[in-house]
């Protein structure tokens, strides 16, 4: 059996919109490499988003693949009013006087209303105002607190259209991070079972506390992503990131709030901080923007995606490219291709400075080093909350991470975490049983094959986040069958198979006896056997009793053993687990 190459490590977030509403296009996006879908709640009503969620869940089920859903809340976006002329816009020239007011007025060539009540109280004279993502700029020359007006001068003119966004760089506004609409949208998203919630325009840790409090009050535990797009959040970066469960480098508004030339440096700092904290980070906005209208990206866009991956981002995001673009599937496919090529290079950012002071961090760091030293085929992480897998991912191991979880929501959330391939496996009574079931699932999906070495990690307090404290190394073996084990330990040897014991002409010391049942004539062979396998399943059978007396591992009740095991084949029996594998135990190094 050949192993299939494990998926690329960098995850891809695709935004849903008019271009990607059909079932067939969504299917193609997943097949092209999208691992999480973003629902932009700045657009569309609840019925629209509900339909998107249902389609995503249906297609993910059909493809037997976990797919995450990220709810992106609109936030308190401040906008100009609506121009009632035929064009729905006005032309502003450099040097023109213009008034912005919080009063409800008819918007014209000289005045526009602004959707912020405390405009004249908080925006001072001399402040810069940017409109339409920075395309237009004004300077506040006079503040009239009585009339609630800002008298401005146009610095950079252009077309100002209805409902365009307004930014106040360097001005601290008291606007709350969550509007009433955001709260309604959040409750809807939680009810629909979204996997992540992104909070827009985060300013401080208290904004994260507020949304987490609402989620907890609703009886949910959905993780929160902080969208960093305000200068206040940059000043309080460490504290904000310590509170949230993930972070988005929202380069659009960030590049308006701060000088555009600062954004690349801030991107690197945000990614590095998120990596150290072990939370997923998404790099977003205009990554392949030319693909809205073109089937191929520019060279600069390819470099932008590549450099975000080299910086250490967990995921790269497509916005307009998949929401309204002409080539949504091609955009995802090209982004996946870029990621796969970059990941071939051994230039992942070093995590040597990442904190190892906690037990989970120390274990996860050791797992990564052990896997690399032993050239393991995979790291298998047993996790109920996703914490163990995230801890391992934090150290950016070269070895693929298979995250074993019984929870569908956790498997979908991990589709945003670098290097992690979720495997859904039932919650079995013991860690060893769960690991064995996971190996079987991985083999069925061709992620592992016989003889592969796997480094396993888990927490002995299962279901408790941050309790990772176990490392185990195993060799993958094909399971031939199972029965009831008697005795202790695991042994390997050459199988001596016969339909009746008397048919075995010669039995050599250390071989494994495989027969339907044993009797008194078999005792001499049983003394020389390394192990015994019988089809008879009684715990009071001759094989069970004599094997126990002789201290020889026995497995009884393996139906069809004499047909399924080939005479002369090397097999391993594990009496503790009741399993029979093909192949031998790995050699034990000495010295």
Swiss-Prot record:
Gene3D superfamilies given in the database record: Phosphoenolpyruvate-binding domains, Phosphohistidine domain, PK beta-barrel domain-like, Pyruvate kinase, C-terminal domain
UniProt-annotated binding residues for substrate: 38, 252-253, 285
Main enzyme class: transferase
Molecular-function GO terms, alphabetical: ATP binding; kinase activity; magnesium ion binding; potassium ion binding; pyruvate kinase activity
Keywords carried by this UniProt record: ATP-binding, Glycolysis, Kinase, Magnesium, Metal-binding, Nucleotide-binding, Potassium, Pyruvate, Transferase
Site feature (Transition state stabilizer) residues: 227
Listed GO biological process terms: glycolytic process
EC annotation from Swiss-Prot or TrEMBL: 2.7.1.40
Catalytic reaction annotation: pyruvate + ATP = phosphoenolpyruvate + ADP + H(+)
Membrane-crossing segments per the record: none
GO cellular component, one term: cytoplasm
Residue positions binding Mg(2+): 229, 253
Pathway: Carbohydrate degradation; glycolysis; pyruvate from D-glyceraldehyde 3-phosphate: step 5/5
Cofactor(s) the protein needs: Mg(2+); K(+)
Domain of life of the native organism: Bacteria
Keyword Nucleus recorded: no
Binding site for K(+): 40, 42, 72
Pfam families in UniProt: PEP-utilizers, PK, PK_C
InterPro entries: PEP-util_enz_mobile_dom (IPR008279), Phosphohistidine_dom_sf (IPR036637), Pyr_Knase (IPR001697), Pyrv/PenolPyrv_kinase-like_dom (IPR015813), Pyrv_kinase-like_dom_sf (IPR040442), Pyrv_Knase-like_insert_dom_sf (IPR011037), Pyrv_Knase_AS (IPR018209), Pyrv_Knase_brl (IPR015793)
Lipid biosynthesis recorded as keyword: no
NCBIfam families recorded: PRK05826.1 (NF004491), PRK06354.1 (NF004978), pyruv_kin (TIGR01064)
Family: Belongs to the pyruvate kinase family.
PANTHER family for the chain: PYRUVATE KINASE
Subunit structure: Homotetramer.
Name used for this protein in its record: Pyruvate kinase 2
Organism taxonomic ancestry: Bacteria, Bacillati, Cyanobacteriota, Cyanophyceae, Synechococcales
Gene: pyk2
């Amino acid at each position: 059996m050949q192993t299939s190459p494990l998926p690329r490590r960098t995850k891809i977030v695709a935004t849903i919109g008019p271009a990607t509403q059909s079932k067939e296009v969504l299917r193609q996006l997943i097949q092209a490499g999208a691992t999480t879908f973003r629902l932009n709640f700045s657009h569309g009503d609840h019925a629209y988003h509900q339909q998107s969620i249902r389609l995503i869940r249906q297609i993910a089920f059909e493809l037997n693949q976990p797919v995450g859903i990220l709810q992106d809340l609109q936030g308190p976006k401040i906008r100009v009013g609506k121009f009632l002329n035929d064009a729905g816009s006005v032309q502003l020239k450099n040097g023109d006087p213009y008034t912005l007011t919080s009063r409800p007025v008819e918007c014209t060539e000289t005045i526009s209303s602004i959707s912020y009540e405390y405009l004249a109280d908080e925006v001072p004279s001399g402040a810069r105002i940017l409109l339409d993502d920075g395309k237009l700029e004004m300077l506040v020359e006079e503040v009239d607190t009585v009339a609630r007006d800002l008298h401005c001068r146009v610095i950079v003119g252009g077309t100002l259209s209805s409902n365009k966004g307004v930014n106040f760089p360097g001005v601290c506004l008291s606007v709350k991070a969550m509007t009433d609409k955001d709260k309604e949208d959040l409750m809807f998203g939680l009810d629909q079972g979204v996997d992540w919630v992104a909070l827009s325009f985060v300013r401080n840790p208290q904004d994260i506390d507020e949304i987490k409090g609402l989620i907890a009050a609703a009886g949910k535990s959905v993780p929160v992503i902080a969208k960093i797009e305000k200068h206040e959040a940059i000043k309080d970066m460490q504290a904000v990131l310590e509170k949230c469960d993930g972070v988005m480098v929202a380069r659009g508004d960030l590049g308006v709030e701060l000088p555009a030339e600062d954004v690349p440096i801030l991107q690197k700092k945000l990614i590095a901080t998120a990596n150290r904290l072990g939370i997923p980070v998404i790099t977003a906005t205009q990554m392949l923007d030319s693909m809205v209208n073109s089937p191929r990206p520019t060279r600069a866009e390819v470099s932008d995606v590549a450099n975000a991956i080299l910086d250490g981002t967990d995921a790269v995001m497509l916005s307009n490219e998949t929401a309204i673009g002409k080539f949504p599937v091609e955009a995802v496919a090209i982004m996946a291709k870029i990621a796969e090529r970059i990941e071939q290079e051994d230039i992942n950012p070093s995590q040597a400075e990442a904190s190892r002071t906690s037990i989970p961090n120390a274990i996860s760091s050791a797992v990564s080093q052990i896997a690399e030293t032993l050239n393991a085929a995979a790291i298998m992480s047993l996790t109920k909350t996703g914490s163990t897998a995230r801890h391992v991912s934090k150290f950016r191991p070269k070895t693929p991470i298979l995250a074993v979880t019984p929870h569908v929501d956790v498997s979908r959330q991990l589709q945003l975490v670098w290097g992690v391939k979720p495997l859904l496996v039932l919650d079995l009574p013991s860690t060893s049983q769960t690991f064995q079931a996971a190996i079987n699932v991985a083999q069925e999906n061709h992620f592992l094959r016989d003889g592969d070495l796997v480094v396993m990690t888990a927490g002995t307090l299962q279901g408790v986040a941050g309790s990772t404290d176990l490392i185990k190394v195993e060799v993958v073996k094909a399971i031939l069958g199972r029965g009831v084990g008697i005795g202790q330990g695991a042994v390997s040897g050459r199988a001596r198979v016969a339909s009746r014991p008397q048919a075995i002409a010669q039995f050599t010391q250390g071989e494994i006896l495989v027969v339907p049942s044993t009797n008194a004539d078999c005792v001499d062979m049983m003394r020389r056997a390394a192990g015994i396998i019988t089809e008879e399943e009684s715990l009071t059978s001759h094989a069970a009793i004599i094997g126990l007396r002789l201290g020889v591992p026995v497995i009884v009740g393996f139906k069809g053993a004499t047909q399924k095991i080939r005479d002369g084949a090397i097999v391993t029996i594990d009496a503790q687990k009741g399993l029979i594998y093909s192949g031998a135990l790995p050699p034990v190094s000495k010295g």
